[in-house]
């Protein structure tokens, strides 16, 4: 298993709140928690940047981390990521912050230590552009946004 360096920035992690870990052998994501000092109200339509109390350093440019919303918060409470998905580059070393957006109709109170997002690690391929005047024709061509049909 590849290694990622982890820096604990909030002393409550590992004591009051568990460190990120895979819940099951088949789990793809690690839960990130709100390392806030007091409950935080997020009004409808508002976004808040939430500290997680940790920083990671992936180092290997063949990998990146992706932050995703927790399905229960999004479906039941209307809390999703303000940027829809977060990307942590391999060379980033600062605190992981989660942009929380309340797309619901009611205020939402985020509890201290609440699980707010999940983080997965993904492979990365850096491509090199080759500038051309035309592309080799394909069946699809420039068709997009529903071009292949609804059903």
From Swiss-Prot:
Physiological role: This enzyme is involved in nucleotide metabolism: it produces dUMP, the immediate precursor of thymidine nucleotides and it decreases the intracellular concentration of dUTP so that uracil cannot be incorporated into DNA.
Pathway stated in the Swiss-Prot or TrEMBL entry: Pyrimidine metabolism; dUMP biosynthesis; dUMP from dCTP (dUTP route): step 2/2
Amino acids binding substrate: 70-72, 83, 87-89
Cofactor: Mg(2+)
Family assignment from sequence similarity: Belongs to the dUTPase family.
Keywords, sorted A to Z: Hydrolase, Magnesium, Metal-binding, Nucleotide metabolism
A GO MF label: dUTP diphosphatase activity
Protein's recorded name: Deoxyuridine 5'-triphosphate nucleotidohydrolase
SUPFAM superfamilies according to UniProt: dUTPase-like (SSF51283)
Gene that this sequence comes from: dut
GO biological-process terms attached to the record: dUMP biosynthetic process; dUTP catabolic process
Top EC class for this record: hydrolase
Catalytic activity: dUTP + H2O = dUMP + diphosphate + H(+)
Coiled-coil stretches: none
EC number, UniProt record: 3.6.1.23
Matching Pfam families: dUTPase (PF00692)
tRNA-binding is among the record's keywords: no
Gene3D superfamilies according to UniProt: 2.70.40.10
């Amino acid at each position: 298993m590849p290694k990622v360096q982890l820096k604990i920035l909030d002393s409550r992690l590992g004591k009051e709140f568990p460190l990120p870990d895979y819940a099951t052998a088949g789990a793809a994501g690690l839960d990130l928690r709100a390392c806030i000092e007091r409950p935080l109200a997020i009004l409808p339509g508002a976004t808040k940047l939430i500290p997680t109390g940790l920083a990671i350093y992936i180092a290997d440019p063949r990998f990146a981390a992706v932050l995703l919303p927790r399905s229960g918060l999004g479906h039941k409470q209307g809390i999703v990521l303000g940027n829809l998905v977060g990307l942590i580059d391999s060379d980033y070393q600062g605190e992981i912050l989660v942009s929380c957006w309340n797309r619901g109709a009611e205020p939402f109170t985020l509890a201290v230590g609440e699980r707010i997002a999940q983080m997965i690690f993904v492979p990365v391929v850096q491509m090199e552009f080759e500038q051309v005047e035309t592309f080799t024709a394909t069946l699809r061509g420039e068709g997009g946004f529903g071009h292949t049909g609804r059903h």
